């Protein structure tokens, strides 16, 4: 007997068709999910076509403020605003890495108008910077300087290795730090071949690295980000020779910068390029500068120096201890020391120290984000 089945009435066949369809749906969905995860992983590790590396990055700096730095937009007419809107011109930033929260580290080549030096500067803004509730707010800035050669890279820009950027976010979320914009310039004009370095200073006859760090780099940040007008929103941090440069910058320019985290620092200038320039060398000596600042004791020049060292840094400890004993907490010079048990002379140790209290201490002395 022949059985003529009506279309769609075979439970088994119909079930089989539905099962196959569901399986294909699951397979396609699974492939899509795996693809998204893989793309995210590849992007995170900067692999292949999924990477944002090298792509243009905007920090929302397209609309400069009016009047050479008065707050722009709705706040342009408020000369008493605490916020400095981007002054322009906008720099060409390119992505070097993307963090898990979507924030980006970007780099530009800055042609320093005041120093005459041309070099790379890496920047990063915390996620809070693009939070709508802070859309008109000025953010504090930290200029982060490396030790070692300090050229052609600045190792603080590698969040995958040292986690400075993600740590800033972590400390902010924990109420232990400000949401700093990070500026990470090269420290020296060329590699430190044969132990040659520039002490972050304007050594006669040499590239003006002091002006580069204290004027050109801040000008770049002011041109492209919403910042704090006053010195209360500007700080340095650095390790080793970078700590010296940051320490010296704050003591030399207390009108521009308020605080520094100086980790395993050199205390006095010692580049051989100073030979024959003793006067200029003294003008860039933190001991001399601290002594002068204390003697003058002018209002509005208080500086906050957060020193750090690991307990295994035998060559660093005596010099830092001596500086603090001589100049610490006298007049406008305020100091704090973070000892990192078992710590050595390296950036990993110093991140630990920042987490232990140095970041919170300088953040308590600063402002931001500030409303217009």
Question: Which sequence ranges carry the predicted segments?
Answer:
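Non-catalytic cap/lid and distal C-terminal segments of serine-dependent acyl enzymes
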Residues: 2-372
């Amino acid at each position: 007997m022949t059985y003529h089945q009506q279309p769609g009435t075979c439970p088994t066949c119909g079930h089989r068709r539905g099962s196959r369809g569901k399986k294909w749906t699951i397979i396609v969905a699974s492939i899509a999910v795996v693809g998204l995860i893989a793309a995210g992983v590849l992007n995170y590790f900067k692999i292949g076509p999924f990477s944002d590396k090298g792509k243009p990055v905007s920090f929302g700096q397209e609309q400069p403020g009016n009047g050479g730095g008065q707050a722009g937009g709705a706040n342009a007419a408020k000369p008493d605003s605490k916020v400095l809107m981007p002054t322009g011109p906008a720099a060409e930033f390119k992505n070097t890495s993307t963090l898990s929260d979507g924030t980006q580290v970007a780099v530009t080549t800055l042609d320093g108008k005041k120093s005459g030096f041309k070099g790379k500067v890496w920047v990063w803004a915390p996620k809070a910077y693009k939070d709508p509730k802070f859309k008109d707010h000025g953010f504090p800035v930290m200029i982060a300087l490396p030790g070692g050669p300090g050229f052609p890279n600045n190792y603080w820009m590698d969040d995958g290795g040292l986690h400075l950027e993600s740590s800033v976010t972590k400390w902010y979320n924990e109420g232990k730090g400000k949401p700093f914009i990070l500026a990470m310039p090269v420290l020296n004009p060329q590699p430190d071949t044969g132990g040659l370095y520039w002490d972050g200073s304007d050594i006669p006859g040499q590239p003006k690295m002091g002006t580069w760090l204290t004027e050109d780099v801040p000008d770049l940040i002011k041109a492209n980000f919403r910042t704090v007008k006053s010195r209360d929103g500007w700080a340095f941090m650095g390790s080793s020779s970078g700590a010296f440069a940051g320490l010296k910058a704050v003591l030399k320019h207390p009108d521009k910068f308020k605080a520094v985290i100086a980790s395993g620092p050199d205390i006095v200038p010692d580049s051989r390029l100073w030979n024959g320039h003793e006067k200029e060398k003294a003008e860039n000596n933190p001991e001399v500068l601290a002594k002068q600042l204390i003697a003058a004791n002018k209002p509005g020049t208080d500086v906050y120096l957060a020193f750090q060292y690991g307990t295994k840094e035998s060559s660093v400890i005596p010099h830092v201890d001596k500086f603090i004993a001589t100049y610490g907490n006298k007049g406008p010079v305020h100091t704090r020391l973070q000892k990192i048990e078992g710590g050595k002379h390296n950036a990993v140790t110093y991140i630990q120290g920042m987490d232990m209290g140095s970041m919170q201490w300088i953040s308590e002395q600063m402002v931001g984000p500030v409303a217009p």
